[in-house]
Amino acid sequence: MSITKYPMTVQGARALEEEHLFLSKTERPRLSQAIGEARELGDLKENAEYHAAREEQGMVEARIRDIEGRLQNSVVIDVTTIPHTGKVIFGTTVVLANTETDEEVTYQIVGEDEADVKQGKLSSGAPIARAIIGKEEGDTVVVKTPSGTVEYEIVEVKHI
């Protein structure tokens, strides 16, 4: 059985590590204390504070395990250490110009967990990312989106 490794940027790995640290060093002890205090209140069957703390503890522990799994099954790619060739690869930041409207957009190609279109971070599996990965500055690509077909020119590829 082979385990699939998932690409992740340095920033994405750092964010998960920080969340893991917060959950394990701050939230876990806080919830343990809250459960202990709720136990002291007596009958656990009808103790809402106890049940709420236990439920939250379960969610925190599940998230900690999820983060640990994601970090174990990731390949962290530092795009700043890769020679700049003008080619779009995982981790690069790409400036695209809509050939019809000349409107420019900037996206960084990131892992699935890091994607946030509002912050300009596209999952490597997104239609636009799939269309531009492997292409170079000056290339034109046609992207099929839910709202129709859009043609972009790759204006600039940055390793930042």
Curated annotation (Swiss-Prot):
Coiled-coil residue spans: 53-73
Pfam families the UniProt entry points to: GreA_GreB (PF01272), GreA_GreB_N (PF03449)
Record's keyword terms, sorted: Coiled coil, DNA-binding, Transcription, Transcription regulation
Molecular function as annotated in GO: DNA binding; RNA polymerase binding
InterPro entries: GreA/GreB_C_sf, TF_GreA/GreB_CS, Tscrpt_elong_fac_GreA, Tscrpt_elong_fac_GreA/B, Tscrpt_elong_fac_GreA/B_C, Tscrpt_elong_fac_GreA/B_fam, Tscrpt_elong_fac_GreA/B_N, Tscrpt_elong_fac_GreA/B_N_sf
GO biological process: DNA-templated transcription elongation; regulation of DNA-templated transcription elongation
Family assignment from sequence similarity: Belongs to the GreA/GreB family.
Function: Necessary for efficient RNA polymerase transcription elongation past template-encoded arresting sites. The arresting sites in DNA have the property of trapping a certain fraction of elongating RNA polymerases that pass through, resulting in locked ternary complexes. Cleavage of the nascent transcript by cleavage factors such as GreA or GreB allows the resumption of elongation from the new 3'terminus. GreA releases sequences of 2 to 3 nucleotides.
Protein's UniProt name: Transcription elongation factor GreA
Species name: Pseudomonas putida (strain ATCC 47054 / DSM 6125 / CFBP 8728 / NCIMB 11950 / KT2440)
Gene this chain is encoded by: greA
